[in-house]
């Protein structure tokens, strides 16, 4: 299961109970789980049945670094809006949550967060810690895809 992020993912995916149930089911089956950018937040809220901890507890997970968070207003326009589907006027004061901070809490004392503020296309950040493939943001999207191919080729 692969989830891609972006600024809308905190609203649509991260807090979505259906997404959490899918992640929990795939995790219980030992399936590979991938998330890019803010979609990594969905891992935080998916829980292990045996102890109620996040499925990423004790893991090394890549997260969008807090240095990249911003507090300027972030609109969520609907592209190609029509009179029948006009969209919303939703605006949040920056990102909905600080991803690095919530991932740090979820991985706990035995895990670690990989958040590299200097990441770019030439120095992307993607990591695998079974069963999780995670990557930082759009600059790491190619590395994320490459890491998924590498991991799935070994299964």
What are these language model-derived features?
Residues 2-34, 39-155:
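Active-site-adjacent pocket-lining segments in enzyme domains
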């Amino acid at each position: 299961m692969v989830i891609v992020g972006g600024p809308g993912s905190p609203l649509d995916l991260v807090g979505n109970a259906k997404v959490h149930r899918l992640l929990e089911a795939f995790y219980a089956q030992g399936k590979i789980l991938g998330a890019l950018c803010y979609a990594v937040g969905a891992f935080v809220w998916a829980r292990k049945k045996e102890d109620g901890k996040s499925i990423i507890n004790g893991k090394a997970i890549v997260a969008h670094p807090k240095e990249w968070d911003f507090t300027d207003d972030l609109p969520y326009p609907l592209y190609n809006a029509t009179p029948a589907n006009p969209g919303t006027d939703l605006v949040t004061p920056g990102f909905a949550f600080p991803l690095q901070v919530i991932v740090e809490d979820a991985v706990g004392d035995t895990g670690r967060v990989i958040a590299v503020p200097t990441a770019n296309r030439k120095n992307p950040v993607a990591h695998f810690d079974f069963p999780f493939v995670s990557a930082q943001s759009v600059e790491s999207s190619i590395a994320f895809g490459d890491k998924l191919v590498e991991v799935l080729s070994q299964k």
